[in-house]
From Swiss-Prot:
Native species: Nitrosospira multiformis (strain ATCC 25196 / NCIMB 11849 / C 71)
Protein name as catalogued: Large ribosomal subunit protein uL14
GO molecular function: large ribosomal subunit rRNA binding; structural constituent of ribosome
Gene3D superfamilies: Ribosomal protein L14
GO biological process, one term: translation
Gene (UniProt): rplN
Complex and partners: Part of the 50S ribosomal subunit. Forms a cluster with proteins L3 and L19. In the 70S ribosome, L14 and L19 interact and together make contacts with the 16S rRNA in bridges B5 and B8.
Length: 122
C-alpha cells in the first residue's frame, strides 16, 4: 500500500535509486496505490551518470509492495520492500532493464513491456 510521502526503491536501470510518492493517480480522493497502479513520483536519490536527475517528477508503476497482493485462489504474495518502475509521459518504461521479480497482475496491455523485461514473474 503506497500513499503520499512513501519512499520506494527503483526496479529499473534509469539511474534513480529511491523515489517518493507525491500523488496517487486515479481519482481525486484516492488514498492508496497497490501493485499495478500508477503514481506520480519525485526522484530523491540518483546514481552518477544516470538517465534521470534528482528532483525530477515522473509517472511510475508500482511493481512490488510490502503489503502484497491477494490472488483469487487465496494466496498472498508479499515482498521485502516497495518498488516502482519509472514511466514517461506515454506511460512506457524509461529504463531498458527491470531488476527483481514482478507479479502477474501487471500482465495488462499497458505493462506487457515491463513483464517481458522482468527476470521473474510471480
Amino acid at each position: 500500500m503506497i500513499q503520499m510521502q512513501s519512499i520506494l526503491q527503483v526496479a529499473d536501470n534509469t539511474g534513480a535509486r529511491s523515489l517518493m510518492c507525491i500523488k496517487v493517480l486515479g481519482g481525486s480522493k484516492r488514498r492508496y496505490a497497490g501493485i499495478g497502479d500508477i503514481i506520480k513520483v519525485s526522484v530523491k536519490d540518483v546514481a552518477p551518470r544516470g538517465r534521470v536527475k534528482k528532483g525530477e517528477v515522473y509517472n511510475a508503476v508500482v511493481v512490488r509492495t510490502s503489503k502484497g497482493v491477494r490472488r483469487a485462489d487465496g494466496s498472498l504474495i508479499k515482498f521485502d520492500g516497495n518498488a516502482a518502475v519509472l514511466l514517461n509521459a506515454k506511460l512506457e518504461p524509461i529504463g531498458t532493464r527491470i531488476f527483481g521479480p514482478v507479479t502477474r497482475e501487471l500482465r495488462t496491455a499497458r505493462f506487457m513491456k515491463i513483464v517481458s523485461l522482468a527476470p521473474e514473474v510471480l
